[in-house]
Amino acid sequence: MRKALLLTFLSIIAFLQAFSQDGKSFVTLDNLHLNTRADFTLDYHPGHDTVAPSTDHGFAGKYLVVALDGTIGSKFSYHLRQRINAPNIGFANTFFQGTDWAYLNWNFTDNLFLSAGKQVVAIGGWEYDSNPIDIYYGTEFWNTVCCYEVGASLNYKDNAGKNHFLVQMCNSPFINQAMQSIYAYNLMWYGNFGVFKTAYSANMIEYQPGKFINYIALGNKLQFKGVEMYLDVINRASFEQDRFFGQDITAIYGIGVDIGKKWIVFAKAGYDFNQAQLPNTEAYDQYVTPGKKVDFESLGFEYYPLGDRSVRLHLCGSHTSVDGISKFQANLGLTWKVDLLHMKN
């Protein structure tokens, strides 16, 4: 079944590519990329109490992803990103569970459009907004959140390109079966003010019918020539808590510095904790669970041998502490991003 779906998917790509050869085509294919990454990872566990130190290591293919975008007439655009090597995510191991997004945009005007299909759950923050293939170490929240669900959003962009607002209703990322009747209600703002950019959201997400966990997610980014840094803060809370702020938090800081055209040196640190409830109680937050405390620090570099972003080598290391238990990790990997639409013979 999976092979048949994959062949159908590739046939659709070939069909769209054939249509895109004609400059007057009703359907266009504007972007077609194949992205993949493979890593060698070494974990060292120092040991604690009666547990002896241990080392684990091995090679792993991380991602194999096809992404395509195009237009249908003058009012519609389509967008698809498919993980060919999708893990068992969600409540059903199906080909569609490996679809990050598959949605249509309907442009009412130059400023207003409706988006419908499987799409990113609109939560603020620049770590959350990053392509997973570009994340080497993530927070506990990033590692556990389900990012993609079926739904719809109404979007507004101003003429200057400084503000993008969207309101979204979609399936709750906490669903574990079809037709579960729980939803997420999201309000998102992307701001672009020169060197300063925002990715802010307010979210009400059902984890059971009528029971909500609420997010206020503030993503802040500064971009200068050759330097990019961001600071994300996510506050999670239920209305049933005594204190709404400061009890269940994720904070992330990241910085990357270009060294010429081929090198980037980066550092990242993150911290998750949940003191909103006692452990072993019915959790309001099912991603960073009650009593959890996780922090990590990482440092590394990326090397682009061709001078563009199509081939990347990375080497980085990290220290992670989960509820006081440490782990050290080294990661060496290769990423390549192939533009299939503009390949030359």
Show the residue positions of the predicted features.
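Loop-centered beta-sheet repeat module
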Residues: 165-214
